[in-house]
Amino acid sequence: MSAIESVLHERRQFAPPAAVEKAAAISGMAAYRALAEEAERDYEGFWARLARETLEWRKPFGKALDETNAPFYKWFDDGELNASYNCLDRHVAAGLGERIAVIFEADDGTVARVTYADLLARVSRFANALKKRGIGRGDRVVIYIPMSVEGIVAMQACARIGATHSVVFGGFSSKSLHERIVDVGATALVTADEQMRGGKTLPLKSIADEALAMGGCDAVKTVVVYRRTGGNVDWHAGRDVWMHEIVANESDACEPEWVGAEHPLFILYTSGSTGKPKGVQHSTAGYLLWVAQTMKWTFDWKPDDVFWCTADIGWVTGHSYITYGPLAVGATQVVFEGVPTYPNAGRFWKMIGDHKVSVFYTAPTAIRSLIKAAEADEHVHPKSYDLSSLRIIGTVGEPINPEAWIWYHKNVGQERCPIVDTWWQTETGGHMITPLPGATPTVPGSCTLPLPGIMAAVVDETGQDVPNGQGGILVVKRPWPAMARTIWGDPERFKKSYFPDELGGRLYLAGDGTVRDKETGYFTIMGRIDDVLNVSGHRLGTMEIESALVSHELVAEAAVVGRPDDTTGEAVVAFVVLKRSRPEGEEAAALAKTLRDWVGKEIGPIAKPKDIRFGDNLPKTRSGKIMRRLLRSLAKGEAITQDTSTLENPAILEQLAEVR
């Protein structure tokens, strides 16, 4: 099979700001290279040093890495620790009990502050309450809860008693929740009466009741309900209990359950190509080490920072950079219940000013939607807010188009904040390829270089390295501590999905088409391998075509998919959102031609979309991710048969289906 072609060439480069570089933990490229070389010289010794420096161990480990049952690797296997202790107790013991752990802002703007001492007490009370209901080490607890302090408390309490949590995003349907409860074999469920988002309520408890009524959930003996709104709920006596009632008389102290380094901390479900969700299982020590270390490296965390990751705890970003990473280093962080556009599209920028956020981490999808709003109304433009507290800004979830990167850099970072464009996955646990704010010169659209200790490479379909400048498949050549350990209950699927025989069985397959720059060696993600289009024998990454479209002055957002074509094999279909109102009729046809010509100029005639459809927005999940599988069906003219329960804006499907 021919190589994936990289056809979009970005040459703009931005050096780390002098003030950031001077104060950074990793200052300058020489410091970065020294760490990377240490890892290459003594791989196990490098990771062992970090693990001893970063975590507190009840029982020290001996050997760092056990490769005897590859690809089911073990790290620090004979050591013992507790994740909750490392996130809470050790900071309180160090005299930081009065440091603010969480600044929680509710959907309606109400703000609450929780200290480390408060959070430890709340976690301990809930942990004691769970233990009294027979929940403990080895049990699985499903958490279906809104963005809240209570959500963090529930996760940390599970870790404290050795139970393995599985958080399900609050936007999932009863069917999706049911599948996960059954697959993981949960003995308890933690939920809420209702969820508040954008001024609207979502009845979580009734959705949970529907899921439990579908059968196969007999192991669930306890349903803990957090009272968020006070809305009416059905009640199952003996099974259902109020969170505030069961913790009321519990002790503020709960001895941590000391567990082995490989003890499953959590199982997080991610969608699979076969339709059955994959329960990605993460360890305790290796995972916690890496989310703490990347807080220090990627975000250059300082004790006086106010950190804000806008993700939901239902996704891995919320696990790693809300519930565990920030707390593991003793950070003060903002946790937000709502959405970026309520009550208006200036909400993020107002909150940055209100809470003096210094490190801000959000998704390219959110940035692109806020660009459109800012272009239409200067009152919600970042320039109308005080963003002077910011020093580092980041992106997560998908590659960021170069033009969106430039807007973010100019208008949010005020051309003085480095952007950390982070590449990683649910399965990797934490950041893998990313700029370091005080070391790496950044290039719009590129995640730049792997972190020290991460042996990333670009290979062909046989696992052989490809030359820089030639597109290929992103892999990681050596195991790392935070990697997923297995797919819950399906180790063969784990091997087949991530360590396929076609690549020799020892390379971690990331599933992303990637190219390295000929000169810098920087990595640029070109899109999922599944999203590579074969147009007249040319294999094109969708990301580059989307970036070309978004670079046009009229375009706010674009998503590109393929559909079968008798002439070219596959045709490029683009779904486009403009910075102004959606065009129709002749105006739409003329603008489609303009954009086709634009892509031809930016990339080449081969990449021109055959079909361009304009929408008021794109189909997205409640977490802001574009649902490309739905766009593929629309492009082919097929009926939508997939689960759309997480779709934020169902009406857009009809609009995009009508447009031809």
From Swiss-Prot:
At what positions is N6-acetyllysine found?
A: K625
Residues of the signal peptide: none
The reply to whether Nucleotide-binding figures as a keyword in the UniProt entry is yes
Q: What is its EC number?
A: 6.2.1.1
Gene Ontology BP terms = acetyl-CoA biosynthetic process from acetate
PTM comment: the record says: Acetylated. Deacetylation by the SIR2-homolog deacetylase activates the enzyme.
- Please list the cofactors this protein needs: Mg(2+)
Name one cellular component (GO) term: cytosol
Ligase listed as a keyword: yes
Q: Which reaction does it catalyse?
A: acetate + ATP + CoA = acetyl-CoA + AMP + diphosphate
Indicate the enzyme's highest-level EC class.
Answer: ligase
- Keywords in alphabetical order, please: Acetylation, ATP-binding, Ligase, Magnesium, Metal-binding, Nucleotide-binding
Q: Which Pfam families does its entry note? A: ACAS_N, AMP-binding, AMP-binding_C
Q: Binding positions for ATP?
A: G397, E398, P399, D421, T422, W423, W424, Q425, T426, D512, R528, R539
What GO MF annotations does this protein's record show?
A: acetate-CoA ligase activity; AMP binding; ATP binding; metal ion binding
Q: Which domain of life is it from?
A: Bacteria
The UniProt record gives the binding positions of Mg(2+) as V550, H552, V555
Residues annotated for CoA binding in this entry: R197, G198, G199, K200, T317, S536
Give the similarity note. Belongs to the ATP-dependent AMP-binding enzyme family.
Query: Could you tell me what this protein does?
Result: Catalyzes the conversion of acetate into acetyl-CoA (AcCoA), an essential intermediate at the junction of anabolic and catabolic pathways. AcsA undergoes a two-step reaction. In the first half reaction, AcsA combines acetate with ATP to form acetyl-adenylate (AcAMP) intermediate. In the second half reaction, it can then transfer the acetyl group from AcAMP to the sulfhydryl group of CoA, forming the product AcCoA.
Q: What is this protein called?
A: Acetyl-coenzyme A synthetase
